Design a protein with these regions (language model features):
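C-terminal boundary/linker of central alpha/beta nucleotide-binding cores
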Residues: 1-62, 71, 75
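Conserved alpha-helical positions within TPR/SEL1-like repeat arrays
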Residues: 119-126, 154-169, 196-211, 238-253, ...
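Residue position in alpha-helical solenoids
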Residues: 103, 107-110, 124, 144-147, ...
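Helix N-cap/loop-to-helix boundary motif
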Residues: 94, 111-115, 149-157, 191-199, ...
Length: 467
């Protein structure tokens, strides 16, 4: 009986009974023997089973738990969670089980025979928004794959692609690049025809390069993906629309708004025309089109498109999904920019969107994630445009701290927030601080050939010299 206890710490009593077929008398016997302890934080319905700390230290931590000893238990959990219809696992029962998977996984010694099991667990943890735990399983699996020199090409590609996706969510772009490049090498060495798969990976790699502010390399990968599609006459509307969309993102980052909008519209038209439209991707198109209109100062159009995207996302995602936060924050930006330029709009319309977006990001992604930094930048701008410069600087500094920690030193987003800090410090006549941040922005912008941004920064540096 005690062999199964390696996986039960913190599990609710009703799950303990369901998955191990233990009845109340069994549980009571274990409690009397001090194998387990029971607590009821919110009454009997929330009763939880925990290993007694002394038993855990003496029996569990000083032995080598075997995956086989708990395999029935683990497989029942996986079977149950795989059957969940939702893309994101969020109900309390499933979350309890995901916690068990994550914690149990730290205790077992895996071999190459368990690669499929580990991959299944990683996917389940991804769906439950447990990104670090999911990535831990994937990296363990990749270590085994590389050590054993597996011939299972499909499994290798699945591991590399999923590890890349999770690393992107964790904002570890260099690791994501490594995983996708390993997938490309695997395909090239396989001697098999993976043309469509290769095009997809090139597109994903381009997205990571864009996130890492490597725009020319990103465009190169998108072009490679499109060339593979054209040469091999691949009919894949989803992939083709993704490439158009991703090129649009590059062009908007380069301030080439006409090309950005043209690519976004092509992506939208393809996504809306297929037999079974993917609402998630259509929402992305609406969101991105709204962003172009925002940059073109067409705020009414921007708000319309961004709200269309939010409406779809709220239908298909749980309330705490980070993509909801992206929509909320962008609508807040729309209202902020509109209020700055048009008296018929009001700044107060923006703040509720910012506050909710920040709350979601801190809860699901953490305080030090790049998306959380975007929330702080947006809130800082909201204060700045209202003349609240100290509050703006406070939020800008939080944003800068995150970006310096997470992103590469010469990232465009670090330059952007450094410029905003210089601008705010100049407003309160703190010339030394203003110049310090503007010089950092200038250095990065020059290295990235951001001509328009560089001109604005150099203009403010001249103002510093005159003050």
């Amino acid at each position: 009986m005690n062999l199964s206890l390696t996986s039960i710490s913190g599990i609710r009593q009703r799950l303990f009974k369901q998955f191990l077929d233990y009845n109340n008398s069994d549980i009571n016997a274990l409690i009397r023997q001090s194998w387990i302890i029971q607590n009821r934080p919110n009454g009997p319905a929330s009763s939880q089973i925990h290993l007694h700390p002394v038993i855990k230290a003496a029996v569990i931590n000083n032995t080598e738990p075997s995956l086989e000893k708990c395999s029935v238990f683990i497989n029942k959990i996986i079977e149950f969670l795989k059957a969940a219809s939702a893309d994101v696992i969020e109900d309390s029962m499933s979350n309890d089980l995901c916690d068990v998977l994550a914690n149990a996984g730290l205790m077992f010694k895996y071999t190459s025979e368990h690669l499929g099991l580990m991959y299944d667990i990683a996917l389940i943890l991804w769906r439950s928004l447990m990104y670090h735990e999911s990535y831990s399983y994937l990296t363990k699996g990749l270590e085994l794959l590389n050590k054993e020199s597996s011939d299972d090409i499909e499994l290798q590609l699945s591991y590399y692609e999923t590890a890349g996706k999770v690393a992107v969510r964790l904002a570890d772009y260099e690791k994501a690049i490594t995983h996708y490049q390993s997938a490309i090498t695997t395909i090239e060495n396989s001697g098999q025809d993976f043309s469509e798969r290769l095009a997809t990976i090139y597109d994903k790699l381009g997205v990571v390069m864009r996130k890492a502010s490597k725009y020319e390399q990103a465009l190169d990968y998108f072009t490679k993906a499109q060339n593979i599609i054209d040469i091999n006459h691949i009919k894949n509307p989803e992939l083709t629309s993704d490439i158009y969309n991703d090129m649009g993102v590059i062009y908007i980052n380069l301030d080439i708004f006409d090309k950005a909008l043209a690519n976004y519209q092509k992506a939208r038209e393809i996504r809306e025309s297929v037999e079974n439209p993917d609402l998630e991707q259509i929402a992305y198109s609406y969101h991105n089109i709204g962003t172009v209109y925002q940059r073109q100062k067409k705020y009414a159009d921007a708000i319309t498109w961004h709200k269309k995207a939010l409406e779809i996302r709220q239908e298909i995602y749980p309330d705490n999904e980070p993509i909801i936060a992206a929509s909320l924050t962008m609508i807040g930006n729309d209202y902020t920019q509109a209020a700055k330029n048009d008296s018929s709009y009001h700044f107060n319309d923006a703040f509720e969107y910012f506050a909710k977006g920040l709350e979601i990001r801190k809860l699901t992604l953490g305080e030090t994630h790049p998306d959380t930094a975007w929330s702080y930048q947006s809130i800082g701008l909201w204060h700045f445009y209202q003349g609240e410069y100290e509050e703006a600087i406070e939020n800008y500094l939080k944003c800068l701290s995150i970006r310096k920690t997470i992103l590469q030193p010469s990232h465009a987003y670090t330059a952007e927030i450094s410029y905003l800090l210089g601008e705010a410090y100049l407003k309160i006549n703190q010339i030394h601080s203003a110049k310090e941040h503007l010089l950092l922005a200038e250095k990065i912008q020059a290295s990235l050939h951001k001509v328009k941004a560089l001109e604005k920064t150099q203009h403010l540096l001249k103002e510093c010299s005159l003050s």
